[in-house]
């Protein structure tokens, strides 16, 4: 069964020479990653992940590098400041094999608190990290750190074979956090954004299936469709 630690206590378990893997965006364990910034003894700490949702001081420290599969604002800022942020080319389908090849000693994620069946739910992120999370929990020479947060919703896949839970008995370290989940702000569109969205809307036929992305223009398109008469 796991030990329950504070973020700082969990951060103390990381070696000066180590590898840490995490998933995209909503998988980021914010309290743990923040606590790592309190140390300055890193010799060769390498992160493997994607799309940070916060700016973490640990990534500004000497001896720390980050292999990133998807750049967001935090990665671009860190890179512009001269820190060791390296892009790992690959599509979403390559996230799982890239992470497996990286083979971090430590895997981390945020999740819901354990349920009555003794499982945590990966909540807002499933992605391609679960197999590596499970491997980290099963091998005694690796470490699985899960940061639980009661503010996270429980989710499940439409397809039953894609489970997004992790049994508590596989977890080495539990961190109890209570921060609010990250939420994207909806910036006000300018005239150009509205014009582009209006052009895109003309290509959406009644009954179409639409995959949207993150950003002002996809938000305008989705909002206009929601308010419109298309089925």
Descriptions of predicted regions:
Residues 1-231:
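Conserved alpha/beta enzyme-core scaffold
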